[in-house]
């Protein structure tokens, strides 16, 4: 692994990971709302 490649890739991977985490959390919240509505 080239150090420059790591320096370029790490912020991109962090950004993708953070976006994926936020999207996943939002999706879980929506699913929980749907489950609550279907039970009520």
From Swiss-Prot:
The keyword Transmembrane applies. It is a single-pass membrane protein. The chain crosses the membrane at residues 5-23. One of its GO terms (cellular component) is photosystem II. It is found in: Cellular thylakoid membrane. It comes from the Bacteria. InterPro entries: PSII_PsbY (IPR009388). GO terms for molecular function: manganese ion binding. One of its GO terms (biological process) is photosynthesis. Keywords: Membrane, Photosynthesis, Photosystem II, Thylakoid, Transmembrane, Transmembrane helix. Disulfide bonds: none annotated. Belongs to the PsbY family. PSII is composed of 1 copy each of membrane proteins PsbA, PsbB, PsbC, PsbD, PsbE, PsbF, PsbH, PsbI, PsbJ, PsbK, PsbL, PsbM, PsbT, PsbX, PsbY, PsbZ, Psb30/Ycf12, peripheral proteins PsbO, CyanoQ (PsbQ), PsbU, PsbV and a large number of cofactors. It forms dimeric complexes. NCBIfam families: PRK13240.1. Loosely associated component of the core of photosystem II (PSII), it is not always seen in crystals. PSII is a light-driven water plastoquinone oxidoreductase, using light energy to abstract electrons from H(2)O, generating a proton gradient subsequently used for ATP formation. This is Photosystem II reaction center protein Y. It comes from Synechococcus sp. (strain WH7803).
């Amino acid at each position: 692994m080239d150090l420059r490649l790591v320096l370029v890739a790490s912020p991109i991977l962090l950004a993708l990971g953070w976006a994926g985490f936020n999207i996943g959390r939002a999706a879980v919240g929506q699913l929980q709302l749907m489950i609550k509505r279907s039970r009520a």
